């Protein structure tokens, strides 16, 4: 399968000629490369925000489970 992938690589001199012909386009590619390089750093905090809400609901359920038995214990002596 690697032999089939070689011909597209040999056809790339057209792109190389386009880069040499227009320095403005090559500069635009460099700026675009910088922008794409910054994007992964922006995605990482978003992944942390997604992970945090998953932990909070589990922690919110535990205190609610602890509070319910206490209320039931307080009500029981009043009935007696």
From Swiss-Prot:
Highest taxon, organism lineage: Eukaryota
GO cellular component: nucleosome; nucleus
GO molecular function ontology, one term from the record: structural constituent of chromatin
UniProt entry keywords in alphabetical sequence: Chromosome, DNA-binding, Nucleus
Gene Ontology biological process terms, A to Z: nucleosome assembly
Biased composition (Basic residues): 11-80
InterPro entries: H1/H5
Disulfide bonds: none
Subcellular compartments: Nucleus; Chromosome
Disordered: region residues: 1-80
Name used for this protein in its record: Histone H1.M6.1
